[in-house]
Amino acid sequence: VTAALPPNKHQEKSLRTRALLLDAALDSLADRGYGNTSISDITARAGVTRGAQVHHFHTRTELFAHAIDHLVVRQRESLHRHIGQLAPDTTPVEVLIGLVTATFAGRLGKAAIELYSSFATDDELRHTMLRSQHEITIELLSTCTELIGDTAPRDRLESTFWLTVNLIRGTTVDEMLGRDERRRRQVVDDWRTLATLALATD
């Protein structure tokens, strides 16, 4: 079997431009929302010409369709960065909340919610979005289970994981609506206390 040749400089530049456009699309989604995100805003953020954008993505819809998988790439990178920052004595609850937050909160979380809502009436894109987010969520659950190990009962860990995912997504929506940040922090703190009890061994 012949090994794949490394990309040449032209290919590398093309891949960089593509990534810049997709990153800019996610940033614009987080800042402006799907309805207000324009091609001109995306190209300006990416620092590329409209011609370069058309070369990679002919339409706005095509660009956002590819942004779905790119979002997962960035979520996975954020997850792995957080894993690398975990201290050896990090508690199971802090592992759980920290990893879920790294994956589903912040700017990436906002971009994901915008994509969810914008694809509500497009069956194909909605299916793609649901599939990709399900895959990263299952990967996240597996990672949490591996890191936490047998320090918490498996059934409780899975239940606490899914509740944490829903809570973090909910606080992200709350942030997008401009609600009270102190209240969001209090909600997460309250959940940290409850989750600690849920994961405690008998």
Task: Locate the predicted segments by residue.
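Helix-turn-helix
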Residues: 20, 24, 28-62, 66
